[in-house]
Amino acid sequence: MPEPAKAAPKKGSKKAVTKTAGKGGKKRKRTRKESYAIYVYKVLKQVHPDTGISSKAMGIMNSFVNDIFERIAGEASRLAHYNKRSTITSREIQTAVRLLLPGELAKHAVSEGTKAVTKYTSSK
């Protein structure tokens, strides 16, 4: 009777693996490579449970998320600077999203962001 297949490790999972050096016997930690892969994978499974993603596509999605993050953070930073504020709040993030994303996409992003902030503050 065939055994059930073990679940494949989540794509993008990061583990600090220790490697033993050749003659010295010293252990060296592998550097951690941070990525949004596990989160992209979770969202993919929520939207399309039967669909997979290639490592190349995952790399593109990771680059996309990093790019959008940097754009929003940069715009929020400028907004805070223009208004002589030293703190980036959810208001700056929301305004940055409205400035960067087009039309309907901005509306959906703002509503999802507001929902996430509300959920976070209510859980405290």
Curated annotation (Swiss-Prot):
Post-translational modification note: Monoubiquitination of Lys-119 by the BRE1 gives a specific tag for epigenetic transcriptional activation and is also prerequisite for histone H3 'Lys-4' and 'Lys-79' methylation. Phosphorylated during apoptosis; which facilitates apoptotic chromatin condensation.
InterPro entries per UniProt: Histone-fold, Histone_H2A/H2B/H3, Histone_H2B, HISTONE_H2B_site
Post-translational modification N6-acetyllysine, affected residues: K6, K11, K14, K19
Bias (Basic residues): 8-17
Keyword Nucleus: yes
Residues bearing glycans: S111
Region described as Disordered: 1-32
Places the protein is found: Nucleus; Chromosome
Alphabetical keyword list: Acetylation, Chromosome, DNA-binding, Glycoprotein, Isopeptide bond, Nucleosome core, Nucleus, Phosphoprotein, Ubl conjugation
Positions where Phosphoserine occurs in the chain: S13
PROSITE patterns: HISTONE_H2B (PS00357)
Keyword Ubl conjugation part of the UniProt annotation: yes
Assembly description: The nucleosome is a histone octamer containing two molecules each of H2A, H2B, H3 and H4 assembled in one H3-H4 heterotetramer and two H2A-H2B heterodimers. The octamer wraps approximately 147 bp of DNA.
Family per record: Belongs to the histone H2B family.
Protein name: Histone H2B 1/2
